[in-house]
From Swiss-Prot:
Any GO MF annotation of the entry: ATP hydrolysis activity
Alphabetized HAMAP family for the sequence: ATP_synth_beta_bact (MF_01347)
Name recorded for this polypeptide: ATP synthase subunit beta, chloroplastic
Encoding gene (name): atpB
InterPro entries: AAA+_ATPase, ATP-synt_VA_C, ATP_synth_F1_bsu, ATPase_a/bsu_AS, ATPase_alpha/beta_chains, ATPase_F1/V1/A1_a/bsu_N, ATPase_F1/V1/A1_a/bsu_N_sf, ATPase_F1/V1/A1_a/bsu_nucl-bd
Originating organism: Agapanthus africanus
Binding site for ATP: G172, G173, A174, G175, V176, G177, K178, T179
Origin organism lineage: Eukaryota, Viridiplantae, Streptophyta, Embryophyta, Tracheophyta
EC number of the protein: 7.1.2.2
């Protein structure tokens, strides 16, 4: 059964007299609390520790019950630093799970895992709150229609299109452009679709979170003059937070997104950067709770934790949540249990390649490794499907010929293979694109390319009509008309030099 949003948070004051416990043990972010007989809190209940530390500073720490140990003891994980806590301090059982503010009041604001604003812009309306632990929608509520979600990014829309209401994984190692791609998607979707986004910053760099916030203010996604007209709510649990906060911040963001879907009946975008850190935080908590580690040191409950989060991200008859999740791949190993478990839940994968990034091709999306369940003729149409397959065949043939080219050179190839290589190199460069959010770095204005324009461009390259143009004309341009204009400019420049 799904728990509906309430119009008030858990009333701590009314429960104070009923259910008080005391801290018995503190090990880092894990607390053991003793309660009176018969007054044990439930699993996932929020506990609050209030008081003063030894130097008189105010303490307010929220914890979440994870285990019932026996002898009237519970083990809880803290959502903030446990500095200053001492044994014997009073602990209040709130009698309910963590609840966070939801609805229009969250737009344009930055929250922590507890739903508290951290942007110094004053309090948030907390009359409507929702618990972060909820069951997934029932089968009867789900929507099964298949439709494409256009992003305006050529390589994505053509070769690995996103499903509206689906789950998409951005796979890549460190420094290949996952966060930049997410920022571009937020920008494009807010401008082209007018949709509401929720961004969950799960254990990523504080600097990146700040950069993203500033970028959103500049691009108008967050409207400083009228904050209610903003298109995104931000929830951050950064690298410096305790593992409990990092493990739950994804659920806080998801709860906010669910309200927009279920109550406001909107199409929502949920960005999670980074889903691997959610698993990593779960692994830390699992070890702190004394569970036996599983493969590669991960928690034994890895599949369950991932499934609980992912099954709530879905389309219902009221609205949809389309989720785009950055997935850090440890040591670029896709067989690691964390990315491998994530794969099972995804409708599309966008794999970022270090090789393409080294060549300067951005977005560095690997056109052969990236996949989508949507790339079927009955969903995208014959023209799109045929063009995508021919692009992949051309790039695959080029990949096969690279060893021969490296040893013998281009001249030893047949005429047909030389033509394939020339077209593949044009396609590879045409898959690059200037981003709006990267304008300050590249100096090139960003481009949003519609799906029809994308298909037309690749059809022209494959047909051989543009064989006479130099390959550098296709690098970092929007549609195919820009490439032909760039080729004319390059030709004019070379004539001037002569």
């Amino acid at each position: 059964m799904r728990i509906n949003p309430t119009t008030s948070g858990p009333a701590v004051s009314t429960l104070e007299e009923k259910n008080l416990g005391r801290i018995a043990q503190i090990i880092g972010p894990v607390l053991d609390v003793v309660f009176p007989p018969g007054k044990m809190p439930n699993i996932y209940n929020a506990l609050v520790v209030k008081g003063r530390d030894t130097v008189g500073q105010q303490i307010n720490v929220t914890c979440e019950v994870q285990q019932l140990l026996g002898n009237n003891r519970v083990r809880a994980v803290a959502m903030s630093a446990t500095d200053g806590l001492t044994r014997g301090m009073e602990v209040i059982d709130t009698g309910a799970p963590l609840s966070v503010p939801v609805g229009g009041a969250t737009l344009g604001r930055i929250f922590n895992v507890l739903g508290e604003p951290v942007d110094n812009l004053g309090p948030v309306d907390t009359r409507t709150t929702s618990p972060i632990h909820r069951s997934a929608p029932a089968f009867i509520q789900l929507d099964t229609k298949l439709s494409i979600f256009e992003t305006g990014i050529k390589v994505v829309d053509l070769l690995a299109p996103y499903r509206r209401g689906g789950k998409i994984g951005l796979f890549g190692g460190a420094g290949v452009g996952k966060t930049v791609l997410i920022m571009e998607l937020i920008n494009n979707i807010a401008k082209a679709h007018g949709g509401v986004s929720v961004f969950g910053g799960v254990s990523e760099r504080t600097r990146e979170g700040n950069d993203l916030y500033m970028e959103m203010k500049e691009s108008g996604v967050i409207n400083e003059k009228n904050i209610a007209e903003s298109k995104v709510a931000l929830v951050y649990g950064q690298m410096n937070e305790p593992p409990g906060a990092r493990m739950r911040v994804g659920l806080t963001a998801l709860t906010m997104a669910e309200y927009f879907r279920d109550v406001n009946e909107q199409d929502v975008l949920l960005f999670i950067d980074n889903i691997f850190r959610f698993v990593q935080a779960g692994s830390e908590v699992s070890a702190l709770l004394g569970r036996m580690p599983s493969a590669v040191g991960y928690q034994p409950t890895l599949s369950t934790e991932m499934g609980t989060l992912q099954e709530r991200i879905t389309s219902t008859k009221e609205g949809s949540i389309t989720s785009i999740q950055a997935v850090y791949v440890p040591a670029d190993d896709l067989t690691d249990p964390a990315p491998a478990t994530t794969f099972a839940h995804l409708d599309a994968t966008t794999v970022l390649s270090r090789g393409l990034a080294a060549k300067g091709i951005y977005p560095a999306v690997d056109p052969l490794d990236s996949t989508s369940t949507m790339l079927q003729p009955r969903i995208v149409g014959e023209e799109h499907y045929e063009t995508a397959q021919r692009v992949k065949q051309t790039l695959q043939r080029y990949k096969e010929l690279q060893d021969i080219i490296a040893i013998l050179g281009l001249d030893e190839l047949s005429e047909e293979d030389r033509l394939t290589v020339a077209r593949a190199r044009k396609i590879e460069r045409f898959l690059s694109q200037p981003f709006f959010v990267a304008e300050v770095f590249t100096g090139s204005p960003g481009k949003y390319v519609g799906l029809a324009e994308t298909i037309r461009g690749f059809q022209l390259i494959l047909s051989g009509e543009l064989d006479g143009l130099p390959e550098q004309a296709f690098y970092l341009v929007g549609n195919i008309d820009e490439a032909t204009a760039k080729a004319m400019n390059l030709e004019g420049e070379s004539n001037l030099k002569k």
